[in-house]
Amino acid sequence: MTRALFIVDLQNDFTERGALGVTGGDEVAARVTAFLADHARDYALIVASRDWHDPDNDNGGHFSDAPDFIDTWPPHCVAGSYGAEYDDLFGASAVSHHLK
């Protein structure tokens, strides 16, 4: 059987230091990295996605200075920003495909 692993939005803006940070995000990044070190060879495909917003438009009204956290959010994962990059503790060397 062929296996694939999908890693979703493991980015700086979703971990402790980020615009939409959550407690434990860095720990998740470190654990995923450790898992990949031990198990990457078990997968034919390893895909990592990144939330990715264009800095030169309104992103469909997605961003707001007064977000309601339902339909609008503070600016996050803006292309080219630190927040849009993978978390500092995520070692992405085993990732075969990167999606934005």
What spans do the regions from the language model cover?
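Short glycine-enriched, charge-decorated loop/helix-capping segments at active-site entrances
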Residues: 18-25, 75
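N-terminal nucleotide-binding beta1-loop-alpha1 segment
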Residues: 6-10
